[in-house]
């Protein structure tokens, strides 16, 4: 009798547990299934799309080129260094020789030369007839406190990271609007969500891109154009090596945080998933940057104190 009572009590326990949690679990599972189905459908939809990627000669841009190429896209590789673009193009064709896809084309592009951008976009349209996805990935960083950073460096950072990407976006939009289809993907940074010491110009450029994308997203929704903003944390690329100092010289060093960052390949994979899910604003970062973001909004005094201590440490080195 005792064993029977225990079994009955156990059965009742699991029945109550199922009664309480199934109404919660089932909708969650259904939502996850629908999300996966949408992701797979949109991933298939990438096949044959024309994708223009800036900063495609190295780092995240190069990784994105591989990911889009493998998805069957017509990849347009854009950057200043034509020789590096040739290398990336060769790698795509050799490493993925068995993939039935489209040969990538090269577009030498200097984002700081605003007057040339319209013609560059037109040349792509003449070849492919459309630009389905623009990936604003090209950019530069800076290492230096605000006062010691020459105003020419501030201008250069904003010119490349913000005005160049904005000009390219505006050049691509008319053809997208005419077709009632397109997507703008802008690679920002967690530093576009919150600023840190010795990155004033870089953070400002990324904050500006955040605001531009938020405004643009609302304005072009009527034309079925999607805007996705990606805010990664540190990625293991040459960003710090290629960064400028406050005087405009080459920084030329690999930061420890950058060296320990996420792999470009993993980040590129996450970006394609975000596109497939039709996400609008995505933070790809570990817990510390996410905590800093929420701290900035929920406990700003604490955030400011932490940043002050960080600045003191940087100023003493």
Swiss-Prot record:
Membrane topology: Single-pass type II membrane protein
Transmembrane segments: 11-31
Enzyme Commission code: 1.1.-.-
One function term, GO molecular function aspect: oxidoreductase activity
InterPro entries in alphabetical order: NAD(P)-bd_dom_sf, Sc_DH/Rdtase_CS, SDR_fam
Keywords, ordered alphabetically: Membrane, NAD, NADP, Oxidoreductase, Peroxisome, Signal-anchor, Transmembrane, Transmembrane helix
Location relative to the cell: Peroxisome membrane
Gene3D superfamilies, per database record: NAD(P)-binding Rossmann-like Domain
Residue ranges that the UniProt entry lists as topological domain Peroxisomal: 32-317
Chief site of localization: membrane
GO cellular component: membrane; peroxisomal membrane
Chain residues that bind NAD(+): 52-76
Binding site for substrate: 189
Active-site residues from the entry: 202
The keyword Methyltransferase belongs to this UniProt entry's keyword annotation: no
Side of membrane Cytoplasmic, spans: 1-10
Family: Belongs to the short-chain dehydrogenases/reductases (SDR) family.
Biological role stated in the UniProt entry: Putative oxidoreductase.
Protein name listed in UniProt: Dehydrogenase/reductase SDR family protein 7-like
Protein source organism: Anopheles gambiae (African malaria mosquito)
Lineage: Eukaryota, Metazoa, Ecdysozoa, Arthropoda, Hexapoda
């Amino acid at each position: 009798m005792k064993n029977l009572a225990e079994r009955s009590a156990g059965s009742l326990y699991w029945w109550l547990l199922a009664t309480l949690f199934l109404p919660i679990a089932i909708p969650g599972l259904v939502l996850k299934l629908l999300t996966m189905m949408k992701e797979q459908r949109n991933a298939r939809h990438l096949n044959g799309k024309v994708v223009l990627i800036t900063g495609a000669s190295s780092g995240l841009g190069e990784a994105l080129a591989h990911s889009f190429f493998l998805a069957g896209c017509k990849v347009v590789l854009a950057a200043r260094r034509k020789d590096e673009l040739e290398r990336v193009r060769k790698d795509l064709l050799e490493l993925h020789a068995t993939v039935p896809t489209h040969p990538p084309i090269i577009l030498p592009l200097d984002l700081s030369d605003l007057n040339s951008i319209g013609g560059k976009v037109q040349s792509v349209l003449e070849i492919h007839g459309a630009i389905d996805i623009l990936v604003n990935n090209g950019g530069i960083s800076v290492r230096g406190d605000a006062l010691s950073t020459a105003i020419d460096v501030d201008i250069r950072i904003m010119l490349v990271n913000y005005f160049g990407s904005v000009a390219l976006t505006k050049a691509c939009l008319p053809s997208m609007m005419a077709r009632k289809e397109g997507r703008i993907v802008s690679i920002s940074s967690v530093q576009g969500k919150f600023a840190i010491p010795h990155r004033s110009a870089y953070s400002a450029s990324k904050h500006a891109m955040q605001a531009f994308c938020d405004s643009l997203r609302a304005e072009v929704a009527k034309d079925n154009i999607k805007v996705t903003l990606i805010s990664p944390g540190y990625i293991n690329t040459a960003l710090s090596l290629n960064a400028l100092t406050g005087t405009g010289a080459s920084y030329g060093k690999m930061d420890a945080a950058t060296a320990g960052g996420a792999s470009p390949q993993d980040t590129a994979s996450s970006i394609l998933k975000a596109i497939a899910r039709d996400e609008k604003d995505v933070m790809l970062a570990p817990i510390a940057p996410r905590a800093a973001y929420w701290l900035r909004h929920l406990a700003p005094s604490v955030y400011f104190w932490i940043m002050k201590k960080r600045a003191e440490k940087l100023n003493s080195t």
